From Swiss-Prot:
It comes from the Bacteria. CDD domains: PRTases_typeI. It comes from Escherichia coli (strain K12). SUPFAM superfamilies: PRTase-like (SSF53271). InterPro entries: ComF/GntX_DNA_util-trans, Competence_ComF, PRibTrfase_dom, PRTase-like. Required for the use of extracellular DNA as a nutrient. Has been suggested to be involved in gluconate metabolism. Disulfide bonds: none annotated. This is DNA utilization protein YhgH.
Length: 227
């Protein structure tokens, strides 16, 4: 997908503000039309009440905000952000996530955080890629929402196997004790920001770490939730 300055990256129509990257029509069109559980973010009967899965076995976070399923048109943009060094895409994707957060705040009273944290990469992967895509999403979000963010708030303690090829059980084992908290979170409302949440194993491990260290509440914000 080619990004052209001044044109919407999805429909190629002129933009009122060129740096947005995605026009308001396409921004609305990217949102999922499925009813999602407000806690786990998976398809559910009601969008304002936890689903049966969460009532039986709730995840270690209280809310999950997502824009859409991991599918076109967002999936190609996320792929370019991560693997083609297209970091200019991050601001446009961050804006999509911001619009979803503000929508959830208007419709459900979503609480804004005291601090947002990135999902960290292992040092070698960060060095190879040159950036952490989660950091690129957090940077504008923290500025727009006037909340704290530090790219080193959570760090990885070791390399882990690629999650994509592991079962849910092995993903959980793979991530056990893989993260370390570097800043105090006692009594704070925290948000974990990631580009894609699949099984939720990674954000669950970080959420548990935050709660063990005294966080008052944890939310997860992501561009895409695999539905």
């Amino acid at each position: 997908m080619l990004t052209v300055p001044g044109l919407c990256w999805l429909c190629r129509m002129p933009l009122a503000l060129g740096h947005w990257g995605i026009c308001s029509v396409c921004s609305r069109a990217t949102r999922t039309d499925k009813t999602l559980c407000p806690q786990c973010g998976l398809p559910a009967t009601h969008s304002h009440l936890p689903c049966g899965r969460c009532l039986q076995k709730p995840p270690p976070w209280q809310r999950l905000v997502t824009v859409a399923d991991y599918a076109p048109p967002l999936s190609p943009l996320i792929h370019q952000l991560k693997f083609s060094r297209r970091s200019e895409i991050a601001s446009a994707l961050s804006r999509l996530l911001l619009l979803e957060v503000l929508h959830a705040r208007r419709t459900t009273g979503l609480q804004l955080p005291d601090r947002i944290v990135s999902v960290p990469l292992w040092q070698r992967r960060h060095w190879r890629r040159g950036f952490n895509q989660s950091d690129l999403l957090c940077q504008p979000l923290s500025r727009w929402l006037h909340c704290q963010w530090d790219s080193e708030a959570v760090t990885r303690t070791r390399a882990t196997a690629t999650q994509h090829f592991l079962s849910a059980r092995l993903r959980k084992r793979n991530l056990k004790n893989a993260f370390r908290l570097e800043l105090p979170v006692q009594g704070r409302h925290m948000v974990i920001v990631d580009d894609v949440v699949t099984t939720g194993s990674t954000v669950a491990e970080i959420a548990q770490l935050l709660l063990r260290n005294g966080a008052a509440a944890v939310q997860v914000w992501c561009l895409c939730r695999t539905l």
